Amino acid sequence: MVDTVFENHPDAEVTFITHLPAEEPDRESLVGNNGKHMVLFPPFPQSQGFHCFHPKLILIRFQDRLRVVISSSNLMEEDWTRWSQCVWMQVAFVSLSHDQDFFSVSEGESKVAEKKLDLEFRTRLIQFLRQCSCPDDRVFNLLRGVCFKGVRVRLVTSVPNVYRKANMNEYGHLRLRTILRSLDEYRASRDIPAQYPPILSLCSSVGTPSANWLHSILASCHGGRAVPEKTALDALVHMVYPTEQCVKESAIGADMAGSLILHSKTYAAKSFPKKCLKRYKNVKGREGSLPHAKYCECSEGV
């Protein structure tokens, strides 16, 4: 797919950032078409633990807007044609040249809030692109003059490293916890009762989720509030996952389903939260497909 993009956009500035194997910590960037086309390989951080480069972020700059796309798909044809995925997209960010009054001095409370969201989104995006080893000139050309007016989302990134103290709240689910805590504080100021709905989660790799880790994720999804006492974990976490039979009967078959990772030893362990698993089922029109989506929802209707 990379070659196809380069071939169809010979005059565009195109940058791909992809991972390297852990045993190959560094590699020279690939540059072509007089510097317009680049493939970059960000190095692994020099810290303990296991790390990988795993974001799926697409930024497309038009003359008058920027399109931001976050998907669960890798840049591989089979990911877009043979797996069930999810895509979030924000389009038509207005160019600053068309909206100078957004940064005018006269503003009310709502406009101040808009500006804060604009600045935060822009800052987080630039910070993340730099952490992905994207050159500053590419970042500047991509975001020059773009005004994120009307953005209604907060950007949460995960950057592998070892963080301590306040830095722990800058990334991953602890940043999510910080954001949602401020929302809970707002609700409390408006006398809106606090709720603790269960989490519905769909993912391709389960790993080895301990009860402590799941409680930590639960707390983050609810702004840091502790799990209600005497509430069973399986009443609060629902992990949707395909069965072995579902994988065998899928369109791609078990041999091609390597993205679905749940080891039998992990499942057999006493500590594994088996009751939290819910059977994945296809809907009409998507028979035989397997999920690669990453989705999480807090909902009373689970």
Which residue stretches match the model-derived regions?
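PLD/PLD-like phosphodiesterase catalytic module centered on the HKD motif
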Residues: 1-302
